[in-house]
Each structure stands twice: as C-alpha cells, then as structure tokens.
Regions:
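Ribosome large-subunit tunnel/peptidyl-transferase-proximal elements
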Residues: 1-103, 113, 131-141
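C-terminal structural segments of small proteins and small subunits
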Residues: 102, 106-125
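Short, highly charged C-terminal tails/helix-capping segments
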Residues: 124-132
Length: 141
C-alpha cells in the first residue's frame, strides 16, 4: 500500500457558501482560508492545491469586535516617497466591502503559488446575490 499524494487528477473540488452577516471578519476569513487550502479534508497535502471553492456573501455586513472599527486602517504604498495611502475601515466598508475580507483571507494563505492559486477560487459579494447558483454550493454556518 502506498502513501496517497494529491494532484490535479485526483482532487475533487466542492463549492461552499459562507454568510458573513453579523459575524466577525476574522472568523469568517479563517473559515474561508481553511476551505481554500483544503485543511478540512483527509486528503490534505501541504504542497498541493487541494482546496475547495468558497463564496462569501453579505461581506458588507461583517463586523469587527472592540474598537477596531474606528482604529483599523488599510494601507497601500505606491513605492514613491510620500506614496502611503491610508483608508479607515468604516470608509472601506462603504466603498469596497469585499476588499476587507479579501485582504484578511490573503494574509492567512501561504505566500507562494499555492496561496495565489487558492485565492483565485475565492468569490466575495457585498450582498446576498451571487452568480454561482449553477454549481449548487453547500451553505455552511
């Protein structure tokens, strides 16, 4: 009997829906990152991309605990002197609510090609409408 090694030929990908309404942003991101990596599968292989597809709905209704709603900033830098841009969390949630969850999940994935490929299977929507009804996703609590 030989050891099982996951590869593209024997990986079975499922579709899952996570509802972020009223739930902490970090807990939703952890659940999504685990599903994207395939850590909940018995066939998990660290060097192979064996995760599932994840749809996050109601990203605009995700909450932060404590005072993070007023104190948290999202920073980007152009690379030029004085090129730092800071956006408060509350303004980001008004303009691009799906970006806050995408940044959180990206930080929890590995910083290599496996993480980059896993992030491509993440679909985030600000409200309850999503486009992947044909895949018959399973709703997770």
């Amino acid at each position: 009997m030989s050891t099982f090694m996951a590869n593209k030929a024997n990986i079975e990908r499922k579709w899952y829906i996570l509802d972020a309404a009223g739930k902490p942003l970090g807990k939703t991101a952890v659940r999504a990152a685990d599903l994207l990596r395939g850590k909940l599968k018995p066939t998990y292989t660290p060097h192979a991309d064996c995760g599932d597809n994840v749809i996050i709905i109601n990203a605009g209704k995700a909450v932060l605990t404590g005072k993070k709603g007023e104190q948290k900033f999202y920073r980007t830098h152009s690379g030029w002197v004085g090129g730092l841009k800071e956006t408060p969390y509350r303004i980001l949630m008004q303009e691009k609510p799906e970006l806050a969850l995408r940044v959180a999940v990206r930080g929890m994935l590995p910083k290599n090609t496996v993480g980059k490929d896993s992030l491509k299977r993440l679909h985030i929507y600000a409200d309850a409408n999503y486009e992947q009804q044909a895949q018959k996703p399973v709703v997770l609590e």
